[in-house]
Amino acid sequence: MTRDARAGRRSLLAGAGAVTLALALAACSSPGSSDSGSSGGGSSGGGGLPDTIKIMDINGLTGPVAFAGSNAAKGTALAVEQIEADGLLGDTKLEIDSKDAAADPQQAASFASQAIADPSYAAILGPSASAQSAAVSPIVQQAGVPTVYVQSGSEGVVVGDFTYRLTPPAASYYDIVGDYIDDQSIKTASVLFNAGNPTLAQLGQDTVPALLDEKGVETVGTGSVEVTAQDFTTSASQIAGAKPDAAFLLLTGPQYPVAIGQLKQAGFTGKIVGFSAMGAGNLTSAGQTAAGAVWPTNFTADQTDESSKTFVEAYEKKYDGEVPNNYAAEAYDRMWFLARGIAEADSADRAAIKDGLKAIADKGFDGAQGHVTFEDGDARVPGVLVEWDGTKEILVEGGS
């Protein structure tokens, strides 16, 4: 599929048009004034904003989502530092109150309830695990507390005008794999997906089969595994036996090294196409065994958008050369999105921030993930195609 054809399919997502980072910041630096609300901070620091705006960050810093949570915390910290230095909110300071909910939905909901009951909190940075977010969203929506998520790809997260998600659904940019299918002359494919993960199940049952059908690729086998599976020998043998040109593996990050290794051991020599969970260092243990695997993603440190390059440079400077991953990029964009909404509202009042976020979502903005637009509270980005070269992920030329 050509870039123009993809653009046509996405025309409904691009209504706001491109907004450069500098212009977006300038627009948000001088929002129209409004009456200050009672929530979110103390005495006024000028205009409609208080001296301090308090935000609860419900994160997973321990447990199975700690890898995502710790990287998200770094992206958030960088964004806060830049927002305050930029003067987007004048002299107002952002106070981020971090709460570790690990992977416990009940704990996440409890923290959200605390923020709801305490008017000093202006907004919430929601958890990244879908089960936690689905537990939080109904109560924050009913209470009217602006809450912005990353990850959390399941249904029941973006449930109304107080909830947003800055991780675009994988299905919304998976079509960029179409050009790779054409370039590699892929005519047959097998599909293996994690049936216990809603996002992966959707990709495996709907998105990928539809793309293969559109490209005229014959699906010679489809299989599924459980959410915690770590033995793929049966599936690998079946895929290798069918000898497809490509195997589409839609799995969780920790599953990929094992699945790819067992697939290669079974004699498979075709192309391997995956999902963004292949990134963020998850193929490091597979090394050269996984070389050549490709996947579409919402962010890679090598993408060419100016706003992405600016983020990567700032992140590496702050964290001693560490290369940012998608978790950090999404959290960075989330914090900037919330800050822009607050600036637009010129108020720490929860309802005013909700209206400010809508105004920013309607316009879109340039961030770490490139140009970000929204559809019904869900972020959309063009996406990029990346490849594992055996030691690191690299941008596939023309893969956007």
Residue ranges with predicted function:
Residues 36-39, 43, 67-72, 87-156, ...:
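Beta-alpha junction/loop-to-helix N-cap segments that form part of ligand/metal-binding clefts
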Residues 42-77, 97-106, 128-129, 192-203, ...:
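Extracytoplasmic "Venus flytrap"
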Residues 163-224, 246:
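An alpha-beta-alpha
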Residues 205-296:
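Extracellular/periplasmic bilobed ligand-binding domains
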Residues 262-332, 393-395, 399:
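Extracellular/periplasmic periplasmic-binding protein-like sensory domains
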Residues 319-325, 339-393:
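Segments of small-molecule ligand-sensing domains
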